[in-house]
Amino acid sequence: MEWFEALILGLIQGLTEYLPVSSSGHLAIGSALFGIEGEENLAFTIVVHVATVFSTLVILWKEIDWIFRGLFKFEMNSETRYVINILISMIPIGIVGVFFKDEVEAIFGSGLLIVGCMLLLTAALLSFSYYAKPRQKENISMKDAFIIGLAQACAVLPGLSRSGSTIATGLLLGDNKAKLAQFSFLMVIPPILGEALLDGMKMIKGEAIAGDIPTLSLIVGFIAAFVSGCLACKWMINIVKKGKLIYFAIYCAIVGVVTIVVSQLQ
């Protein structure tokens, strides 16, 4: 992987991790364009995912600081309930990761057709949430957290946007837009770090291929993903507040159709 390829893929990861257009789907498309095999860029994937975690920590640091300050009061307060909701939201993705990891990895290797189909599904979900007008709720309940977690678990499929699925689901449930966007970005931190840790351990044990990627490419990819992630995270929170997700539905529909056509021509 050349440094300019790492730059482009890092930018793609940083932007699409937060924008509701599927980071996994766009990385699959970008890797296919550059001729990069999925098994050969595991180290790069870990690096750019960790970079987006740092982006979240930077942009949402005030919220994270608020959570920890309240959590260490060791009492049942709003901060503790927030953490409980995040833990509840992790249950579905944890089950998928433990029991269905091999099946998910097999789907990732199935080509661009599944990516295109899932992008169309993302477009449909975003459109539905845009036109639906449920009554707004002030706080995210435990039940809502679990349902949003189910949406996150489904979004392990390449092309089905994680942020799009979780935010659209929360909007359909009537959750507060600003709080929903923040919750969506915070709830993904533990799963990303957990997956990165497991993949890193596999590389150390020799159970997975790290890929012969130059250090410069890893550094460039990390910086690109971090910077673009910071911009996208802040931008996306404002987009959700203003209710402008329909534009991303149109984008996903167009890219989905093009991806399906290209997959059939290969």
UniProtKB/Swiss-Prot annotation:
Major enzyme class: hydrolase
Pfam families according to UniProt: BacA
Residues that span the membrane, as ranges? 41-61, 82-102, 106-126, 140-160, 180-200, 213-233, 245-265
Record-listed E.C. numbers: 3.6.1.27
Lineage, top-rank taxon, reads Bacteria
Does the keyword section mention Hydrolase? yes
**Any idea which UniProt keywords this protein has?**
Antibiotic resistance, Cell inner membrane, Cell membrane, Cell shape, Cell wall biogenesis/degradation, Hydrolase, Membrane, Peptidoglycan synthesis, Transmembrane, Transmembrane helix
One GO BP on record is:
regulation of cell shape
Which terms does the record give in the GO molecular function aspect? undecaprenyl-diphosphatase activity
One GO CC term of this entry? plasma membrane
Q: From which residue to which does any coiled coil extend?
A: none
Localization of this protein: Cell inner membrane
Reactions catalysed, as given in the entry: di-trans,octa-cis-undecaprenyl diphosphate + H2O = di-trans,octa-cis-undecaprenyl phosphate + phosphate + H(+)
Query: Where would you say this protein principally sits, based on its record?
Result: membrane
What this protein is reported to do is described as: Catalyzes the dephosphorylation of undecaprenyl diphosphate (UPP). Confers resistance to bacitracin.
Instruction: State the family named in the UniProt similarity comment for this chain.
Output: Belongs to the UppP family.
Protein's name in the database: Undecaprenyl-diphosphatase
What organism does this protein naturally occur in?
Bacteroides fragilis (strain ATCC 25285 / DSM 2151 / CCUG 4856 / JCM 11019 / LMG 10263 / NCTC 9343 / Onslow / VPI 2553 / EN-2)
Q: What is the lineage of its organism?
A: Bacteria, Pseudomonadati, Bacteroidota, Bacteroidia, Bacteroidales
